[in-house]
Amino acid sequence: MSNPIVTSLKILASNTAADKGLEVVELKFNPHSKPITIQVQIQKKPKKDVSLDDCAQFSELISETIELSKLINEPYLLEISSPGLGDLLQTDKDFKTFKGFPIEVLFKNNENTKLTKSGLLHERSKEYLLINIKGRISKIPREDVITVQLTSPTG
């Protein structure tokens, strides 16, 4: 038997996506995580990749739709992605779009040892990558950064 909240969320997401020329590829609902997690994968019709802007715009629309529906009466985490959207952040636009998102940074230190740090993307300037690690801003020189990858806060 299907969960009625999941069924309603799928209908809301599909209708919201269709209005923007998108379709929902997959919707996952995890009521056991704190906060509740809703993961939605979208793509353009017919089966074309979406841009980061498409994901951001859909996130705003579906968030508002869920709030108005009153289906979920407690805090929740909404994750929007695409089956074809890469996890690596590379362009200035990527870094602006995903400000505040969880990331993992692979970088080298002064001894050329590879290290990783995880936190929330704060900013990428001309000189540094700034990440928020438990409320503290950590600066990593941009020339030391090897990769910056989006991660899921749900593991």
UniProtKB/Swiss-Prot annotation:
Gene Ontology cellular-component terms listed: cytosol
InterPro entries reported for this sequence:
Ribosome_maturation_RimP, RimP_C_sf, RimP_N, RimP_N_sf
Which UniProt keyword terms apply here?
A: Cytoplasm, Ribosome biogenesis
Q: Where in the cell is it found?
A: Cytoplasm
Q: Tell me, what is an example of a GO biological process annotation in this record?
A: ribosomal small subunit assembly
Q: Which domain of life is it from?
A: Bacteria
A Pfam family: RimP_N
UniProt function note: Required for maturation of 30S ribosomal subunits.
The Swiss-Prot or TrEMBL record describes its family as follows: Belongs to the RimP family.
Q: Which HAMAP family match?
A: RimP
Protein name per Swiss-Prot or TrEMBL: Ribosome maturation factor RimP
Q: Which organism is it from?
A: Prochlorococcus marinus (strain MIT 9211)
User: Which gene carries the instructions for this protein?
Assistant: rimP
